[in-house]
A protein has these predicted regions:
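Residue(s) in the substrate-gating loop at a strand-loop-helix junction
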Residues: 4
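Short, flexible catalytic-loop segment of classical short-chain dehydrogenase/reductase
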Residues: 8, 45-56
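Active-site loop immediately N-terminal to the catalytic Tyr-X3-Lys motif
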Residues: 9-15, 91
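A conserved structural motif in NAD(P)-dependent oxidoreductases
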Residues: 70-81
Length: 113
């Protein structure tokens, strides 16, 4: 599943989005138990990366700078997310199920930023 790091903290104007992603994570955990051992089920919780959904935010340089300041490792790219997904799809993750993988450049640990 692709969820969002927003499911792990509150964010102004994101209550419905955060709640829906929290539901995705809950479903993931239930399915991980129900489908084991035949199927592994996990969630990837990306931070904000440049996508079609966020493209409008990248038109404002001041906004981009404020967003980047909240990420200890700086802004991420889509490839940072798909590398985690590729790991989870590989045999290297054969003993991984029911887990949330937060891939957000440290944003979740820097909530005040």
């Amino acid at each position: 599943f692709i969820s969002s790091n927003i499911s792990n903290f509150g964010a102004k104007a994101f209550s419905v989005y955060g709640a829906s992603k929290g539901a995705v994570d809950s479903l993931m955990r239930s399915l991980a138990v129900e489908l084991a051992p035949r199927v592994r089920v996990n969630s990837v919780l990306p931070g904000g990366v440049r996508t079609a959904m966020t493209e409008h935010m990248y038109q404002d340089e001041n906004l981009v700078n404020r967003i980047a300041a909240a990420y200890p490792l700086g802004l991420g790219e889509v490839k940072d997310i798909y590398m985690t997904v590729n790991f989870l799809l590989s045999d290297a993750a054969r003993w991984v199920t029911g887990q949330q993988f937060t891939v957000d450049g440290g944003r979740t640990i820097n909530i005040t930023g």
